Amino acid sequence: GKTFAEVCAAGLNYLAQVYHDGTRVTYPLYSEEEIAAVPARAHAELYYCPAQQPGARFAIVLSGNALYYSGELRGGVSTAWELHEQGYAVFSLRYRIGWEAGDDAPLEDLARAIRFVMDNADTFGVSTEDYALLGYSSGGQLAGVFGNEEKGWGRYGVPKPGVLLLAYPINN
């Protein structure tokens, strides 16, 4: 198998290539007006790793962040590349964290990201059925909470995830 560094490099090289070929790979989740109202929203962003075939299922990767910073480029890129190799379109979410963001900010960002992908499914070439959430550490906790109808997907009015993959989720 490949080393972690080789997998990360392959993922970053792929993103650079699709960007060079004209595909947008970064998407802010909030408008300038929404960011002006809540400046912490500027941190929320999606990184897009397109599938090779249209109509692919999609996954959202939620990296861990030690509750202080987001690790989407470490865990997110390598996981995105591995899922891409399995036929998925993958989005790595940089979600808001920290005291200034507030307790529900990561859930709000995840719901916004899911809605954004669903609303733009044709642009991204993805199926809207049975999306996956894959989270590491605090991202795993976020995915797990979001899998609960009362606190997650149902509260935010988005479809229920088809699968949750929780890698060492933390518990506060």
Where are these regions (language model features)?
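N-terminal cap/lid segment of alpha/beta-hydrolase-fold proteins
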Residues: G1-P54, D103
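Stable alpha-helical elements in mature extracytoplasmic
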Residues: C8-G11, G75, T79, P106-A113, ...
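N-terminal carbohydrate-binding/catalytic regions of secreted carbohydrate-active enzymes
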Residues: H43-Y47, S70-G75
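Short beta-strand element of the alpha/beta-hydrolase
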Residues: A56-N65
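Short beta-to-alpha linker loops that shape the active-site pocket of alpha/beta-hydrolase fold enzymes
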Residues: N65, R94-G98, I170
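Catalytic nucleophile-loop/oxyanion-hole region of alpha/beta-hydrolase
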Residues: G71-G75, L93-T128
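Short amphipathic alpha-helix adjacent to the substrate-entry channel of hydrolases
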Residues: L73-F91
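Primarily recognizes the serine-hydrolase "nucleophile elbow" in alpha/beta-hydrolase
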Residues: R112-N172
